[in-house]
Design a protein with these regions (language model features):
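Small/aliphatic-rich secondary-structure junction motif
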Residues: 2-50, 149-150
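Structural beta-alpha unit
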Residues: 1-2, 16, 65-99, 136-150
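Short glycine/serine/threonine/alanine-rich loop segments
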Residues: 31-34, 72, 96, 127
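Short, solvent-exposed loop/turn segments at secondary-structure boundaries
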Residues: 47-52, 111-113
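Conserved beta-strand positions in the Rossmann-like core of class I SAM-dependent methyltransferases
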Residues: 36, 75, 130
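Short, surface-exposed alpha-helical segments at coil->helix boundaries
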Residues: 50-61
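Gly/Ser-rich helix-loop-strand patches that form or flank binding pockets
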Residues: 26, 90-140, 146-150
Length: 150
């Protein structure tokens, strides 16, 4: 049995995506996981919907070849709506075993005022989370060693 059969990776199009992907590569190699890349198109009006969906797909189209080139099974999904809600919904719908995502490490005041994407996901799902800080630097894929209790 594979511990992480499917890893969901919500992308926000910022440099933290690279750090998250390095960790995901190591885990996917260790567990022969399918990687599901998610970009949520968050739009406020119908007029911006097509543009946001196209932008989301463009982000996925830039990232997927990096993983496919290493031989991973990769699926891309464009979500629609509120990013945290859609991430939780997709994780459940796609039967994911792990959500690997970046966190920008904003201060406590900003989290209280605006909320935190990672916090909202954490409170809304039972799927395990791997959180990678934006300022953690890009870890080489070979430097991540998953510890597993058998």
């Amino acid at each position: 049995m594979t511990l992480f059969r499917r890893i969901l990776v919500p992308l926000d199009g910022t440099p933290v995506d690279d750090a998250v992907l390095n960790h995901v590569i190591a885990l996917a190699e260790a567990f022969h996981s399918e990687v599901i890349l998610l970009r949520v198109a968050h739009f406020h009006t119908r007029d911006t919907m097509t543009h946001e969906v196209d932008d989301a797909q463009a982000v996925l189209d830039r990232v997927a070849p990096r993983l496919e080139g290493r031989g991973f099974a990769v699926r891309t999904v464009v979500g629609r709506g509120e990013p945290a809600d859609d991430t939780v919904e997709q994780a459940t719908k796609l039967d994911c075993d792990l959500i690997a995502m970046g966190t920008h490490g904003h201060g406590a005041l900003k989290r209280v005022v605006f909320g935190s994407f990672a916090e909202r996901v954490r409170h809304a799902t039972d799927v395990p989370l791997l959180l990678v800080k934006a300022n953690a630097g890009a870890t080489a894929a070979g430097e991540v060693s998953p510890a597993v209790d058998a």
